[in-house]
Amino acid sequence: ERGITLSGGQRQRAALARALLADAPILILDDALSSVDNQTATQILRNLSEGTRRKTVLFISHQLSAAASADRLFVMDQGKIVQSGTHAELIAQTGLYQTLWDKQKLEEILQ
């Protein structure tokens, strides 16, 4: 950092930029949006979508709205895959994804 103090969100954005510049065919993002606000997260996701069209992206997140646009979602509970499908398919099912989605949407409304 050499005398420059970066916030958590700034560090995350810098790490994400480095990962994208590496131009690897597979990109693994583990909770890459945890330190950024919702507006910044939306912008990052839009840019990621455009910048990773021909790549495999494994996007790990507890923020379901960030993962909703993925081609395929895998829902894990206690280390096991309990559901998989698109966002629309998982919302239509009664299960963990639908429960978590409803809870997160309610939390967003209350904030």
Q: What feature does the model see in each segment?
A:
Residues 54-61:
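Conserved H-loop
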Residues 32-36:
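ABC ATPase nucleotide-binding domain "signature" loop
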Residues 7-8, 14-19, 59:
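ABC ATPase nucleotide-binding domain "signature" region
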Residues 1-4, 10-13, 39:
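Conserved ABC ATPase nucleotide-binding domain "signature" region
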